[in-house]
Structures are given as structure tokens and as C-alpha cells.
A protein has these predicted regions:
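Extracellular, beta-strand-rich glycan-interacting domains
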Residues: 176-177
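Short, well-ordered, aromatic-rich surface patches in folded extracellular/luminal domains
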Residues: 172
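Feature responds to low-complexity, polar/acidic, surface-exposed segments characteristic
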Residues: 2-32, 39-62, 66-97, 104-167, ...
Length: 213
């Protein structure tokens, strides 16, 4: 009986360690967001909460896109010029240079009638569309309707991350990291399929307001 009890305690201890190990693991969304936060690409709120289960707005998406594809110092130098290119009437002041840059580089477009839809949520199709536009090596023929399917086929996203009508900030973070990898960044996945990300020879983008509306 004593031996059985010792073995049982050992099993319980092992199970406890296993549970602790699993609890310490980060999800792909958490790992991707942590990297993007350190790089100054995706920011959280005043409490440093990345709000991974929440959506993001089209204004926030423009900021993310700009930080991915442009040199931060050059963008800062030309920010007034890009701000002047933003003719939409519904873009907040902090986002005008980002939206102007994205429009000038054919990454985003407005709705017409002077509206960009700054506060509108980003759909999964829109998220995949802009990420595909960030790439210059996509041979597949795609459009807005097939953007999610194309992104999955190219390995930019898992099917479940773009299955909902609107994309979450966490799934957007994963999508961005896979896009960065395809753009030549040194992005590695660990054996547990959690992103282990590093960037060589690149500058962190400037951090500006990107809190949730």
C-alpha cells in the first residue's frame, strides 16, 4: 500500500508539471502579437492589453500595413506628404498619414463619396486582401472573394483563422507574421507550432496610437 501511494504521488506530481507546462505555452496568436508588439508594429491599449479576441478597425489596419512595408524613418520624414494624400473625410488625424500612404501604394481603397470607413471592422477577406497586396511574388489569380482561400493556399493563414466574417487582432497578428516570413524576414516556427520569431537587419517601426476604438 505504501509503495502504491508513493507511485500515485509521483504520478500526481508528473501530471501537475504537465499541466503547468501546458499552461505556460503561448498560443500562436499570443506569440505573434508579442513579437509584433516588441517590433512596434501592433500596439495594445494603455494597460498593454493586446486585445487579441477583439477586432480591429480599418484605420488601425492602415497603420499596421504601413509599418510592415515601409522604412519607419523615411515614412516619418514624408509623413506630411502622405497626410496630404488622404482626402477622406472620416479619417482621424493620427491615421491620415497611414491611410494616405496605403492609398498611394494601392494597398487600400475607400468606399466612395469621400469615405474610407475608418471605424469599420476589418473583415477576414479584407485582411487577406491587403496581406496579398503586400507580396510581389503571388502568381495565383485572386480577387476579394477568393482572398481568404488564396491566403490559406499560400500558407499565410490557417483556414480556421480566416473563417469568420471579421478577423480578430490575434488572427491578424498571425497573418502578418506569415506575410513577413514570405517577404523575407527570418520567421521560424518552434516544434510546438508556436511562432518563434526574429527579424534580422530591419528597423522597428515607430509606435503611435493604435488602441481599440
Amino acid at each position: 500500500m505504501k509503495r502504491i501511494r508513493v507511485i500515485s504521488l509521483a504520478v500526481i506530481a508528473a501530471l501537475s508539471l504537465t499541466v503547468t507546462s501546458f499552461a505556460a505555452e503561448k498560443s500562436p496568436q499570443q506569440s505573434a502579437a508579442a513579437y509584433l508588439s516588441e517590433a512596434g508594429i501592433m500596439l495594445g491599449n494603455e494597460s498593454s492589453d493586446m486585445m487579441l479576441e477583439q477586432g480591429l478597425t480599418r484605420a488601425q489596419m492602415a497603420a499596421l500595413l504601413t509599418r510592415i512595408v515601409t522604412d519607419p524613418e523615411q515614412f516619418e520624414t514624408d509623413s506630411a506628404f502622405y497626410r496630404s494624400l488622404c482626402s477622406f473625410t472620416d479619417v482621424p488625424e493620427w491615421a491620415k498619414s497611414y491611410v494616405g500612404y496605403c492609398v498611394a501604394n494601392n494597398l487600400v481603397a475607400g468606399y466612395g463619396n469621400g469615405r474610407y470607413g475608418s471605424n469599420d471592422p476589418v473583415t477576414s477577406a479584407a485582411a487577406c486582401t491587403v496581406m496579398l497586396r503586400c507580396l510581389n511574388d503571388v502568381d495565383a489569380v485572386w480577387d476579394y472573394q477568393s482572398a481568404c482561400r488564396t491566403a490559406v493556399q499560400l500558407g499565410l493563414a490557417a483556414e480556421e483563422t480566416v473563417a469568420d466574417a471579421e478577423i480578430t487582432r490575434g488572427n491578424m497578428a498571425v497573418l502578418i507574421c506569415h506575410t513577413l516570413a514570405r517577404r523575407g524576414y527570418d520567421v521560424k516556427l518552434s516544434e510546438t507550432a508556436q511562432p518563434n520569431l526574429s527579424v534580422n537587419g530591419t528597423s522597428d517601426a515607430a509606435a503611435v496610437q493604435e488602441t481599440a476604438e
